[in-house]
Amino acid sequence: MQLDKKIINHVHCLGIGGIGVSALAEILLKKGCRVTGSDVSPNKNTERLQRLGAEIIFNHDGTAITQADCAVYSSAIGATNPELMAAKQAKIPLLKRGEMLANLMKEYQSIAVAGAHGKTTTSGMLSHAFVEANLDPTFMVGGVLNNSQTPARVGNGHYFIAEADESDASFLFMHPDIAVVTNIDADHLSTYDGDFNRLKQTYIQFLEQTAQDGVVVLCLDDPILREIAPLLSRRVITYGFSSDAQYRVVDYCQQGIQSLFQIHSPQRKAPLTVKLSMPGQHNALNATAVTAIADVVRMNEPALLKSLADFPGVDRRFTIRGEMILPKGNALIIEDYGHHPNEIKATLAAARAAWPERRMVLVFQPHRYSRTRDLMTEFVSVLAETDWLVLLEVYSAGEMPIPGADGMALIKMMSNGMAQKTTFVPLLQNLPETLQKLSQPNDIIILQGAGNIGSIVTALVQTHG
């Protein structure tokens, strides 16, 4: 659907409290639209939007939507949602979140960042670099940037940086000038009828929708992207630790929670020395993707390096929350949004490198029954890498329970040795008491998951022995 900006003055957002729709609403507000919205309950996102002028109600009874010029909804909104049904009855144009985003991006030189893992940090890091280089970008990413405390910005520059979502295939609405893919993994397969090859072909379609004179940036360390790269008709730039990557990461080392490495590239006679205030080889890859794009747009090199060095990260991405006070010392609390086995593996590796002598306690809240079922073996394998596992019940994210895909099913799949160092906590509110009992001074406690696990952070950090 094409938007006529002359008649679209009032947009209603269903599920406005979600990170994706709230970011879109913020951009619409800053572009002068009247924004109304609805959700089931208030949160930090709705509070931020209300301060910006959004009119929000906390129910879905269908009364608020009928005066809007168009309505935007996310994949979390079901077909029987009263507001969705009311909009259809009133013949109000309905756009998916990704469709509205793609319409906004058409006004700019657009950069879309896709991938199973790392796209939020990469798009956030890229947005920060463009701001630091005075390119005054507009951006919309899938997390709250720690420096600006917002997932979105409207600038006066030529560039629009956005996270591209494969979870509902809505990245196919986009036709970017530059497309980035960090990796491809077997996630969100329900969107693709359980067919990984269909997921892969959809990524190819997305990349082939890049502008004819555009650029595709791919991580060559990913075997699927390595397979895809020669098939594309667009100009391809590759990056990675791989020896044949055009932008190649070398001499990586981690010092505490900082990363140091060099990037060899065709554009430079000497390697680029990069410092990041973030741990993990996965973040070195994210920074290398940013460097490749910076070269495409001819960004000032000192500004690029400064932006990488001082990028403070994205909320819930290896975020240090504080210390939990124990009777005889403290334990450090870290929160991370990762909910796929490969993301958990990267988080644990970064934490091990930062604190090699300290015990790792992983508190994991599985996200979706379908993902738990599809990746059960992979979860069991990666969870065994922690010193102690505290397993919460699956966060449903709106799914109905699936037999054999809950927390107890995960434990039953574990080896006897792993099961003996696992504590199952069915109710999130019981977590502070459990951690007080099992934690030891100097423990690193990682709260891992994309559900509501973060809501317990305040209680943990303020818990006294």
Curated annotation (Swiss-Prot):
Q: Which Pfam families match?
A: Mur_ligase (PF01225), Mur_ligase_C (PF02875), Mur_ligase_M (PF08245)
Q: What is its EC number?
A: 6.3.2.8
GO molecular function, a single term: UDP-N-acetylmuramate-L-alanine ligase activity
Q: Return the GO cellular component terms, semicolon-separated.
A: cytoplasm
Question: Major place of localization?
Answer: cytoplasm
What does the UniProt keyword field contain?
A: ATP-binding, Cell cycle, Cell division, Cell shape, Cell wall biogenesis/degradation, Cytoplasm, Ligase, Nucleotide-binding, Peptidoglycan synthesis
Q: Membrane-spanning residues where?
A: none
Q: At which positions is ATP bound?
A: G115, A116, H117, G118, K119, T120, T121
Q: In which pathway does it act?
A: Cell wall biogenesis; peptidoglycan biosynthesis
**Reaction catalysed by this chain?**
UDP-N-acetyl-alpha-D-muramate + L-alanine + ATP = UDP-N-acetyl-alpha-D-muramoyl-L-alanine + ADP + phosphate + H(+)
Localization in the cell: Cytoplasm
An example of a Gene Ontology BP annotation on this entry?
cell wall organization
Annotated InterPro entries: Mur-like_cat_sf, Mur_ligase_C, Mur_ligase_C_dom_sf, Mur_ligase_cen, Mur_ligase_N, MurCDEF_pg_biosynth, UDP-N-AcMur_Ala_ligase_MurC
Tell me the HAMAP family matching this sequence.
MurC (MF_00046)
The family line of this record is: Belongs to the MurCDEF family.
Q: What does this protein do?
A: Cell wall formation.
| Name of the protein described by the UniProt record | UDP-N-acetylmuramate--L-alanine ligase
Source lineage: Bacteria, Pseudomonadati, Pseudomonadota, Gammaproteobacteria, Legionellales
